[in-house]
């Protein structure tokens, strides 16, 4: 009987870790990796590491306990088969975007669900999130839109200067 307690304590510790990761992550993606090779999984982990994204594999039963604690039970229906959990702490769409892009090249990986801004999302919704531009892209678009009027003014000034020189 005493040998069961350490195993139970270890599982409770893992559940607490999962709860903490989901709470602290801006975005979480859940994907099935059933037929992914070791090389493909290593490649996914390398790509994630470059982007500051964490890739973890947990037993679905432990994730079920964690999502129940977080009132995200809508995710339970996606916790079947072999799942990989991808956590993005810096960019809310980073995890979904990474998995969606990787799945385009590796059909063995299937984006199933996720958590975005603290809400559970089904497959269609998380795929929609994955198509959104990243934070860096949005900053670039914003800066470009701010600079556009300035460029127009500079073009007019240059045109006037050119006509005066002629």
UniProtKB/Swiss-Prot annotation:
The keyword Hydrolase does not apply. It comes from the Bacteria. GO terms for molecular function: large ribosomal subunit rRNA binding. It holds the Pfam family Ribosomal_L10. Keywords: Ribonucleoprotein, Ribosomal protein, RNA-binding, rRNA-binding. One of its GO terms (cellular component) is ribosome. Gene3D superfamilies: 3.30.70.1730. InterPro entries: Ribosomal_uL10 (IPR001790), Ribosomal_uL10-like_sf (IPR043141), Ribosomal_uL10_bac (IPR022973), Ribosomal_uL10_bac_type (IPR047865). CDD domains: Ribosomal_L10 (cd05797). One of its GO terms (biological process) is translation. Forms part of the ribosomal stalk, playing a central role in the interaction of the ribosome with GTP-bound translation factors. Part of the ribosomal stalk of the 50S ribosomal subunit. The N-terminus interacts with L11 and the large rRNA to form the base of the stalk. The C-terminus forms an elongated spine to which L12 dimers bind in a sequential fashion forming a multimeric L10(L12)X complex. Belongs to the universal ribosomal protein uL10 family. This is Large ribosomal subunit protein uL10.
